[in-house]
A protein has these predicted regions:
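Sequence-structural signature of mature extracellular/luminal beta-sheet repeat domains
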Residues: 1-286
Length: 286
């Protein structure tokens, strides 16, 4: 934010929080459920991907997630940052319930792309997908469905490409945008009708992402405990280590957008570090 604060979703805390430069915290609105990705819209309101709530269980070798005890489905919420008024914009698309909305990005036209990660149960899982919606609650469309575990979403600087990072496959997919809310679907065997930009070897898992002004895609990478920077051509430019095995998101701030704010979820902290390249300024960033 322009005042140096950062707004983020606390899934386990079931709230949206503003963190001031001095580290003080203030809850905004009453999100409930499991607020995840947050973005500022053209009206200055906060738009929240709410996964409906999640339970995290840790074993010696794996961190698993499942629906919370009061889970009733996911939604896209709108929160007025001044009054705290919170309301649900979308909880389904064409009669199909949203499962666990995860990440969100606005285009310059005022609409937004968002991912639905899906939900893991004991012996089955809901599929995820990529969607596009308008902030007035009038329209939501399904762009890609089903996907395995679509997580981070971002736009190229020219807004001709939408990127989706898939968690379990640790692959970055790209889809060509024909017009706002409409993507080009390539025939089989194109993955999900798009293209696979890059995949990582070994056991690494992608989470949310941000885009640099150069067009490189910066993806929070679980297990490896780093931010993976990938060029639009698919080259792994660098991996920047962070002091946490579960970095889940990254955004850029500061006067020249060279400060990277990174959520460190294993330790429950927000970290900040100087970044070698400026980030891409988000639409409607305030």
């Amino acid at each position: 934010m322009s005042d140096g604060s950062v707004i983020l979703g606390e899934i386990s805390g079931r709230k949206v929080t503003r963190i001031a430069p001095d580290g003080s915290k203030t809850e905004i609105g009453k999100a409930g459920g499991g607020p995840n990705g947050v973005a500022t819209g053209p009206d200055g309101a906060l738009y929240v991907c709410n996964n409906g709530g999640a339970v995290y269980q840790t074993s010696p070798s794996f961190l698993s997630t499942g629906p919370g005890p009061d889970y009733k489905g996911g939604s896209i919420q709108r929160i007025d940052p001044k009054t705290g008024e919170t309301r649900v914009l979308y909880s389904e698309c064409n009669g199909h319930k949203l499962s666990a909305p995860n990440d969100i990005v606005f285009d310059s036209e005022g609409g937004f792309y968002f991912t639905d990660l899906g939900k893991r149960y004991a012996n089955q899982r809901d599929h995820g997908g990529l969607y596009y919606a308008l902030p007035d609650g009038s329209k939501v469309v399904e762009l890609v469905y089903p996907m395995l575990t679509p997580n981070g979403v971002g736009l190229s600087p020219d807004e001709r490409t939408v990127y989706v990072a898939d968690t379990e496959s640790s692959r970055l997919f790209a889809f060509d945008i024909v017009e706002p809310g409409k993507i080009k679907h390539e025939p089989f065997p194109a993955p999900y009708g798009g293209r696979c930009v890059c995949g990582l070897p070994g056991f690494q898992r992608f989470d949310s992402l941000a885009v640099e002004a150069s067009g490189n895609i910066c993806i929070a990478t679980l297990i490896a405990g780093c931010i993976t920077v990938i060029s639009p051509e698919g080259e792994v430019v660098r991996q920047v280590k962070v002091p946490d095995v579960y970095p889940t998101n990254i955004c850029f701030g500061g006067p020249d957008l060279r400060i990277a704010y990174i959520t460190l979820s294993a330790s429950g902290q927000l970290g900040a570090m100087e970044w070698p390249e400026p980030g891409l300024r988000l639409n409607f960033m305030v």
